[in-house]
């Protein structure tokens, strides 16, 4: 399974820990990190959603401070 992961700055620590754990999982063939230090939650939400819609990944995982922003975006 290919997974895109993304987070704005306030979710970076959790995102990094999850990406590391996913990379160790034998069921996951690729973890695509679409984050940058200055990215906002709407931007990263759109990038992860687009990666799923275009078929570049099978699943998307978004992390932010509360989850509300990424859910709305």
Please give the residue ranges for each predicted region.
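A generic "binding-loop/recognition-motif" signal
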Residues: 10, 67-68
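Short helix-capping segments at alpha-helix termini
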Residues: 22-27, 56
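Short, structured active-site "lid" loops
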Residues: 44-66
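Short Gly/Thr/Asp-enriched flexible loops that form oxyanion-binding sites at enzyme active sites
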Residues: 69-73
